[in-house]
Amino acid sequence: MFFTLILSSFLTFVELNCENLFDTKHDSLKNDYEFLPQSSYKWTPYRYWRKLANLSKTIVALGYEDLSLVGTASPDNPSRPSEKSWHVPDFVALCEVENDSVLFDLTRRSALRGVNYDYVMTDSPDERGIDVALLYQPSSFALIQSRSIRIKPLPDTRPTRDILYASGQIMNDDTLHVFVLHAPSRRGGEQVSRPYRLQVASQLASAVDSIYALNDSARI
């Protein structure tokens, strides 16, 4: 599942749920037994790399064609018109990624390896090891800082995924603030899940308010 949003006609944002992007190795600190080669799900290296290939192709396909570059001089051969007018998204928010290893494989060992994405991610206390991440184009977003916002658990509840916050300088020298979150699922029904989702929304609102308190025209 994904959506694409164009901001100010020059930045492209995409959100993509990776739907359990786990590697094939066991993390002794996490409950990732479902996603191992010997598990009932049979999460083999072949299935893992096929998933990475599909995700990378999806991200590339969600880019856009910059018609302003078509027919201009190619940097490799000034006498030849450029045909390289396809731009991948400037930002890709990813949900349900396990660790830095899978992000390295996605950005450096898949169809995205020539795209030059950098990334930041959370390290949440989620029992399964599920996190969120942000891929970004360094040419569009010069990272200033990133951090995880820990969700304060409600009484008698399990830890959930952190919110990822990142700020950076964009092309017009403004500072852009980005939040990536994956709210608790509605498993168990709307009434059961609503308090958890409201807790996440409340902490997100608090973080946004703190930015606006310092700059009421901040770009978020």
Whereabouts are the PLM-identified features?
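Residue-level recognition of the N-termini of beta-strands and the immediately preceding loop/turn
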Residues: 11, 87-90, 117, 176, ...
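Short C-terminal domain-edge/linker segments immediately following a structured domain
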Residues: 42-50, 123-126, 149-154, 208-213
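N-terminal, active-site-proximal structural segment of metallo-dependent hydrolase catalytic domains
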Residues: 6-112, 120-124, 130, 201-202
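A short local loop/turn or secondary-structure capping micro-motif enriched for an aromatic residue
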Residues: 22-23, 152-154, 185-188
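Structured beta-strand-rich core segments of catalytic domains in phosphoester-bond hydrolases
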Residues: 96-177, 183
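Extracytoplasmic, non-cytosolic globular domains
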Residues: 164-220
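Classical Sec-dependent N-terminal signal peptides that target proteins to the secretory pathway
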Residues: 1-4
